[in-house]
From Swiss-Prot:
Organism for this UniProt entry: Rattus norvegicus
Keywords, alphabetical: Disulfide bond, Secreted, Sensory transduction, Signal, Taste, Transport
Lineage: superkingdom: Eukaryota
Name of protein: von Ebner gland protein 2
Biological-process GO terms, alphabetical: sensory perception of taste
One GO MF term: small molecule binding
Function: Could play a role in taste reception. Could be necessary for the concentration and delivery of sapid molecules in the gustatory system.
Primary location recorded for the protein, binned into one broad class: secreted
Alphabetized InterPro entries for the sequence: Calycin, Lipocalin, Lipocln_cytosolic_FA-bd_dom, von_Ebner_gland
UniProt similarity note: Belongs to the calycin superfamily. Lipocalin family.
Localization: Secreted
Length: 177
């Protein structure tokens, strides 16, 4: 369960099998504050344990050269901890790598304004996984964006039954429970 939560927490991502999605613009601006609206992955969620997961907004900053710095706070072992990672820009628009190229992240604009689908695939501890996330500029669920995400999940070969919608939390003070 901890490995699954860590995988979930560390994955910031973008679009299910590039051929299933439109090409992205060269200079898409994903910097700013984003809220996780929904997530789905290729692994079964044990007893839907993530139903009570609370997430805080993530901050994305565009670095020199087009790389992205992603920061967010997660509750790990009962304590709030800040996580940060750098997504390295590739030659392909909307495609990034993380952890020395071991993981690939695609950033795909949703059909709904101010929403993106991040699709992430890679390996952690020799286990391959795929995760898709719907993020938006505000914390409210947008039904049209959720339907777009469900279609993207299906198109990408992930199971729409594995979609879960986390609870939104504005803060998780570092070190707090």
């Amino acid at each position: 369960m901890k490995a699954l939560l860590l995988t979930f927490s560390l994955s910031l991502l973008a679009a299910l099998q590039a051929q299933a999605f439109p090409t992205t613009e060269e200079n898409q601006d994903v910097s700013g504050t984003w809220y996780l609206k929904a997530a789905a992955w290729d692994k079964e969620i044990p007893d839907k344990k993530f139903g009570s997961v609370s997430v805080t907004p993530m901050k994305i900053k565009t670095l020199e050269g087009g790389n992205l710095q992603v920061k967010f706070t997660v509750l790990i072992s009962g304590r709030c901890q800040e996580m940060s990672t750098v997504l390295e820009k590739t030659d392909e628009p909307g495609k990034y790598t993380a952890y020395s190229g071991k993981q690939v992240v695609y950033s795909i604009p949703s059909a709904v304004e101010d929403h993106y689908i991040f699709y992430y695939e890679g390996k952690i501890h020799r286990h391959h996984f795929q995760i898709a996330k719907l993020v938006g500029r505000n914390p409210e669920i947008n039904q049209e964006a959720l339907e777009d995400f469900q279609n993207a999940v299906r198109a990408g070969g992930l199971n729409p039954d594995n979609i879960f919608i986390p609870k939104q939390s504005e803060t998780c003070p570092l070190g707090s429970n």
